[in-house]
């Protein structure tokens, strides 16, 4: 629910006037709440949505600030599940239809056209797709200006990737410089929406080795975290580094655990429940493992699958550790559930 995300922003002290409202499925009540809160703008993703926003704003005797999310048909060169800027994706208004959409928005009595939005995907590791999308969007902005529709801002979304394994994504400064070269001389406020690039490598998932299973063809390290805690490996076949907190240096001694290739798996009853495969690790039962780069799309994608309460979250600031999200209890998990009356 998009409205719920807005409410969390406001509850955390966020400013609605600095908040853009994206999403392909905005409901009427969500639009009403966003207008009431005074959001910066709606990123409109379809003609039908534009019509609904106009109706809602008119019913409330106000104008809705909008930016149209344009789909530039650019290959982000990322996992297909998180590619959002191709014409076959569900996001945005096709760049071929965008001129008509802007004309309708400009003619609408209760719509205030502010800008243009473009977000082509997540975990991009190259500059070229960003630049390609920017060039197409700027060409559209020029055509709009010729029609008398002058935009105030350009929102390039997010998508800047991070290093999980051996990727070499551009640094934020490189990303900014590449965009700036194409924006010189333009009177546009530039918005960006970094998420993974800020949070991704700031978080780790800690998990304990419950058992080691040695089979003829494969070794398993069964841990107490699972796909419900960290969905990315199962959903995207994503690779995240797994490091034992206890490093064993003398692996040749009789008492040391030898290095073996392990699949690190959880307790959930699915073969797809894994955090990593074919990892060369020296492990013993009871070891604590750190799954790195879990700060983005970790807890937010977690679930209660297999009746598993979600993990606690700890924020570390210098030498101060604070519980910022308590471990979910079974009672909370079952809250709101009811048995049919006899």
Language model features with spans:
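Active-site-proximal beta-alpha core segment in soluble small-molecule metabolic enzymes
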Residues: 3-153, 162, 167, 178
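Conserved N-terminal phosphate-binding loop of PLP-dependent enzymes in the Aspartate aminotransferase
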Residues: 171
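Hard-cation-handling environments
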Residues: 182
